[in-house]
Design a protein with these regions (language model features):
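Residue-level detector of extended alpha-helical repeat arrays and alpha-solenoid scaffolds
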Residues: 14, 27-31, 57, 88-89, ...
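Short, motif-level signal for alpha-helix interfacial/capping segments enriched in acidic residues
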Residues: 31-32, 63
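Alpha-solenoid repeat junctions
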Residues: 25-26, 37-38, 64-68, 96, ...
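Charged low-complexity stretches with an acidic bias
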Residues: 54-91
């Protein structure tokens, strides 16, 4: 795990390392270790949600959720609002579902109202 996080800190093979770290932290002890190793690196994880590669953005958001980093809930929501790729949007919501984001409830409710008035195809429903 130290190697994976070291690679992330060096911004090497980011998409693959985010995915690998997500697999590693399924174990509770590994989750605690990852949180220690990533202490103070909130900005790094947030920066990955702004990556050019859509799968990197997706994995970054999901990792933040997996790590239960509620202090980043505002950043995850901002990234959700800015995201253009539909298949990534759902990952931001999945991440938010694992975070304490009560303060975002008014914005989430507003977004839900907007979506109610949109015409959504069956193919796109899972991405919203």
């Amino acid at each position: 795990m130290k190697e994976i996080i070291g690679n992330l800190l060096k911004k090497e093979n980011v998409r693959q390392n985010l995915s690998s770290l997500r697999q590693e932290i399924k174990d509770e002890n590994a989750l605690a270790e990852a949180l220690k190793l990533l202490a103070g690196e909130d900005e790094l994880l947030v920066s990955f949600m702004g990556a050019e590669d859509a799968k990197t953005r997706k994995n970054a958001a999901l990792l933040i959720g997996d790590l239960h980093m509620s202090q980043l809930s505002d950043e995850v929501f901002k990234a959700y609002e800015a995201e253009q790729m539909r298949f990534v949007k759902g990952s931001y919501l999945a991440a938010l579902s694992q975070l304490d984001c009560k303060e975002l409830l008014p914005q989430l409710m507003e977004r839900a109202k907007e979506l109610e008035h949109m015409t959504v195809t069956a193919e796109n429903r899972k991405h919203i």
